[in-house]
Structure formats: structure tokens, C-alpha cells
Amino acid sequence: MVLSVVRESWACFTALERRNIALYVVGIMLYKFGLEAFNGSIVALATNRYDYDAFVSNSTSKTFERVGLLTGLNQAFQCIGAILIAPLVRRAPTKLVLAISVLAFGFFTAVLLMVDAITGGKFVPKNFRNSHPRNDFSYYGKYNTDGLIPIYSVTGVAYGMVELIRRVIPRDIVGGNVQKLRRLDALVHIFYEISGTGGAFCTALVLIPKLGNNYSFIITPVFMTMAAGTWYCITDLDFTPQIQDVLSEHPAYVKATLGSFLLFFESFWTGGKLIFTNRRFIWLLPGYAIALYGHRYLENGIAPAIARRYLGNSAWSQLIVGGSNLGELLGASFVFFFTNLITTPIPWIRLDAMMLLIVWYLPFWYPPPGQVRYAWIAAITFLPISFGWAAGDVSLAAYIQATLARVESRTKNVSALGAVMAFLYTTYIVLYAITSPALGRYIDHVFNESGGAENGGDIRPAIMNIGAVQFTCLSIVILASTFVPQGAFAFNPQMLFDQQLDTEILKAGKPDDGLNMSKPRDDGNHTGNYSIRSGGRYGGRYGSRHDCRRGSSLAYRHDTCQGTHLP
């Protein structure tokens, strides 16, 4: 069964699409492996350094307030990178923007390695590898720990560009057919999480113990460079640069200075307008942005706190994240294999909302510190939470790509798909950037008030509020959003808004098509066109199966995974 599904899915794509998909998947795996090594190391490094600073100076711990600020600012700078994508992908090939972004990311990670080496940093001592003292990190570089914040923040610009563009490029590779997009998104997510799971476990079990978290991301610049080279080999995908109307009457230097700022806000405004003025998209805000916030806070906020304060070893947060990545892998796999059975993202998003409630066990969990098997237990419990999120994310991303591909021409200076994804991604980033430092400060307050590092401080009351209570609220909001789309009250709806998306499109719909892409008539037929093809409801790269003559090369393909149908 599995092999037949894989063969059928692979046969959906043309030879050129298969080549580009293979290059894209190899690049995304290289990128993800390097990313996991960097993100896991930097959070553990910051956690240890701030704890060590408090220990040496005999001061009150502000570890998770600072770690929250570190990750929050990184997310805020991702906002800039995400917004810049919408105008950039209309002026340069997507592969070029992606390659340059990931090269910039690798460069800034190399800067941090050089700073540590210049200030006297060393690899972890051999006698620390099997039994690391709880508060001895004297082998780290002698720089101000707050110096991590600006460097990590700047990497957020490149990170935000890469994370958003990888949600846009599948549409460029295979077009607007939702069947192809669902399969491609799921396929990419599967390999992405295979690499992410391997990267997380490799970082926690090999790189950090052998090198220390100040050098465990030494592989990141290498992997990022390899990913950039791989992505650059993708074909240009029929790219045609589009002329910028913003400040077009001004000299080049004025356009260069001001145009980016205006397009930044126009992109955000366009995405917000598309979302808030149409029922088709309003539910994406909680379904995508808030769900993504919950997933990221689980990995970047709760997992480090559990690893350091419950288990006594910040490096084990990567084991927990590895379990989360494995859940994402399984979730994406389920979407891949059941794409024809579950045709909308609604059931997956509802599953995601229910799985968030698993965190209720954390405030009542008392694992003995220093035993790695309890980190594995936490990883196993994070698996189903991320399973639900990944399944919803993959399916919802394909839905967004297919829907927005049909209204691209309504936007002038920015891509409609890029603008909507940028707005959703920016909303998540702003939410995370605001809440992460505040919740981190709350964790530190509870820890210090209950005794701190010297007197058995306990963060369980904080975990009750930032974990159990917060995630219950998120669950309710996400679950409620799944009842907004027309036709979503069914347990497994076959279609939303009576809109058929599993068809090919040649290009975006006409400006006067509006967003009302499939309006039912009183007689039960449909009057809306999905694309420019005349003579039928389903737009595409091919002519209508009802209009073309026998022997014509223009055959309508309704479900490309089932082959081409001739009249």
C-alpha cells in the first residue's frame, strides 16, 4: 500500500517537477539539519551562560526572562525577513532569494563562532563529557552574554525569509493544483522532519556532549552553504520580473531607499486586507498563526524550562525537541498517505487543538534530575502534540497556496500568496515576541520566589499557567475557528466554500474574478471560474474536456493524480 501511494504520488508530477522537487528536498534537509544544530545549541548556550553569570555573581537568576527576550527578538526580526519576501519574489527568481537568504544565515552563525573563539572559548573539557558539573561553564568565551541577543536577532532576518519562502516555493514548482500541493507539502515536510529529528538528536547526543554548546553548531555554516548551492540548481520556473509601481516616478536612489519600506507595509496591509475582508481567509489567523505560536512556544519556551529546571541539563531540551520533530514527521506522513481521504485541513486542525491539552500533565510531573530517560519520556509526550500541528500545518499550507494562486492578479506590487503568508507569519512572530519575554520573566519570578537555584526553587506553578492554562485557551480558539468556513460543520468535509481546488491553473485569475471563486447558483450549478480557461468551471493548463475535440492536445485534467482524461 505504502509503495503504491508513493508511486502514484510521484507519477502526479512531470519530469521537470520531479527534478526540482528532488533538488528542493535535498536543500531543505541540509538546511533543517544545520538549523536544528544552531537553534538547539544557542538556546542551551544562553540558558547555561545566564545561569552561570547568576552563579558567579551570586545574583538573582533572570535566565528565562533573557532567553525569552533572545528568542522573542529573533522572532521579531523574522518578521522583517518574512515581509521582505512578498516584493522580492516578484522581482527575482524564488530560488535566488532562497539561496542568498540561507547563505546570509550561515554567515551570521559563523560570526558567533568566531566571537567565542576570539574571547578565549574552548571545546568542552574531556572530563566534563560524561558528567558535566551543574554550574561550571568556565570554558565558554569571556564575552557579555547579552552579546548573544543582537547576533541571534540578526540571524532572524535570514531565518524569517527562508521559513516563509519555503511555504511559497511549492506553488512555483507545481502550480496551483491542491492535490499536487498537498502531496508536495507533505513530502517536503516528511523529509524536513526526518532531517530535523536527526539534527535534534545528533545535537543533543553527540555535538553538545563532545564539543559543548558554544561550538556544537560548527556544522551550521557548512550545511547552509551546501543548501544554498543545491537550491540554486533549481530551474527558474518561468520567472518573469514584475515592474514595481511604488515610487516608479522617483530616481533610483529614492526608490532604493524608500521603496523597500513602502512595500514592507503594503505587503502587510495587502495580506491583512485579504484575511479580514473575506470569510475564506479570516479563520486562517487562529488556524495557522495561533497554532504555530503554540507549537513554537512548546519547543522554545516550555522544553528548555523543563530540561533545565526539571531535569538539570539544558542540552536535553534538544531530546525533547527531537521527539516533537518526530511527531511532525508522522503528522506530515499521515497527510501524504491520506490526502484523498481527508481533503480539507479541518479534521487535522481539530486534532491539533485537542492534542494541545496533553501539556496538563507537566505541572504534576516530578522526575528525578540528572536522568536522561525522563527527557525521553517528555519527548514521547510531545510527539502527539506535534503530530496534530504538523498534519494541520501541511494541509492548511496547501489549501492557502491553492486558494491564493487563483487570485494573484488582484495584488499589484506584492504577491497575494506571499502577502497572506507574511501577514500570518508576522502575526505569529509579534505574538511570540511579546509573550515570550513576559512569560520567561514569570518563570524566573516563580523560581526565585520558591527558593532559587540554592534552595530548591520550583517552576511547576508557572508551568501550570504558561503551559496548561495557556494551551487550553489556545485549544479553544483554534477549535472554534474550524467552524467558520462554509461547509466545515461536517466531521470530515469534502470541500470548503463549494470550491474545487484539485485542478491545474495556468495563471492567476482575472482581477474582476474577485475572491468569489465558486459561487453556487440557485439551480445547484456553479458560476464562478477558477482561472482563465473558457468553457468550464475548472481552470487549468489544459482545455475543457467538454469543449476539446477528439485528438486535440488540449485535454482537461480534473484530478492530475488519476491521469489525463480525453473526451
Give the label of every model feature segment.
Residues 90-107, 127, 211, 339-358, ...:
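Cytoplasmic membrane-interface "Motif A"-like loop-to-helix N-cap segments
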Residues 2-79, 278-322, 436:
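Helix-loop boundary and gating motifs at the non-cytosolic
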Residues 78-82, 196, 297, 317-342, ...:
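Transmembrane alpha-helices of Major Facilitator/SLC transporters
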Residues 1-23, 174-297, 473-545, 551-567:
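Intracellular loop-helix junctions on the cytosolic face of multi-pass helical membrane proteins
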Residues 101-141, 353-372:
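C-terminal ends and interior cores of transmembrane alpha-helices
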Residues 94-96, 205-224, 416-419, 437-476:
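A membrane-interface helix-boundary motif in multi-pass transporters
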Residues 346-395:
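C-terminal transmembrane helical hairpin of 12-TM major facilitator-type secondary transporters
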Residues 66-89, 97, 101-109, 322-335:
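Central cavity-lining transmembrane alpha-helices of secondary-active solute carriers
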